[in-house]
């Protein structure tokens, strides 16, 4: 459904932000 789609999309964004922060810290 639409909710599942947005949940997956949100997780992708969160993962990108987390990986981006790790690169900034390094």
Swiss-Prot record:
Name assigned to this protein: Oxyopinin-3b
Keyword Signal appears in the UniProt entry: no
One of the protein's GO biological processes: killing of cells of another organism
An annotated Gene Ontology molecular function: toxin activity
GO cellular component terms listed in the entry, alphabetical order: extracellular region
Domain of life: Eukaryota
Function as written in the Swiss-Prot or TrEMBL entry: May have cytolytic and antimicrobial activity.
Origin species: Oxyopes takobius
Entry keywords, A to Z: Antimicrobial, Cytolysis, Secreted, Toxin
Tissue: Expressed by the venom gland.
Broad class of where this protein is predominantly found: secreted
Subcellular location(s) per record: Secreted
């Amino acid at each position: 459904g639409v909710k599942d789609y947005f949940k997956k999309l949100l997780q992708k964004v969160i993962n990108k932000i987390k990986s981006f922060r790790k690169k900034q810290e390094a």
